[in-house]
């Protein structure tokens, strides 16, 4: 493939993913700079800034951000915010008590713990941090709409002026977030406002 072409870039990406020898040799080295950034966060405002900055790198957390056609005016694109923040598929995985779901939660906890140990964290600390993450995700899940509720197009269409929605989440500076994302808008669709209201509170208390 000619250098610089789309075909060449796709081929390089595929080969890099198949090069397991190099992957094992590098370990978690490629993400060390990002982990250092995360470890340097001192307060929730710095966390918000990091989340906004990382969207430009394709790493999304805290904000379920996107741009797409307005459901009621399909000729216009609009900024969308939706619920996010869970490692499991939806809120049911955090609250259902059947045996299968309980097993999934148990294995998920093991998975999180393993990720910590792979980055050099000792087992005791890894266990503690993994439990803290699952606890936080469970708190976030409480604010999420159910899969059934997500299928309701009316319930999930909530258009706001940015200034008006800002009043509902006073500790999340939307102008700062959008400026850091290089986004300019005065209107947005918020699929699940309760998530962002809960996030506004959780950021200050967790």
Give, region by region, the residue ranges found by the protein language model:
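Noncatalytic, helix-rich "gating/capping" subdomain that lines the substrate-entry/channel surface
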Residues: 3-206
């Amino acid at each position: 493939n000619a250098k610089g072409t789309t075909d060449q870039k796709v081929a390089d990406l595929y080969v890099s993913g198949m090069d397991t020898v190099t992957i094992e040799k590098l370990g978690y080295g490629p993400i060390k700079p990002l982990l250092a950034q995360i470890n340097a966060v001192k307060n929730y405002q710095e966390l918000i800034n990091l989340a906004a900055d990382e969207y430009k790198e394709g790493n999304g957390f805290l904000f379920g951000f996107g741009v797409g056609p307005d459901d009621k005016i399909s000729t216009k694109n609009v900024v969308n915010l939706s619920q996010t923040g869970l490692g499991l598929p939806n809120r049911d995985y955090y609250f259902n008590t059947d045996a299968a779901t309980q097993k999934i939660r148990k294995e998920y906890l093991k998975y999180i713990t393993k990720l910590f140990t792979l980055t050099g964290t000792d087992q005791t600390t890894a266990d503690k941090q993994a439990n803290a993450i699952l606890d936080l995700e469970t708190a976030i899940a409480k604010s999420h709409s159910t899969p059934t509720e997500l299928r309701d197009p009316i319930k999930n269409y909530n258009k706001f002026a940015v200034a008006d929605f800002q009043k509902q989440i006073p500790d999340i500076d939307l102008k700062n977030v959008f400026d850091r994302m290089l986004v300019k808008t005065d209107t947005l669709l918020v699929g699940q406002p309760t998530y962002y209201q809960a996030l506004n509170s959780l950021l200050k208390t967790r």
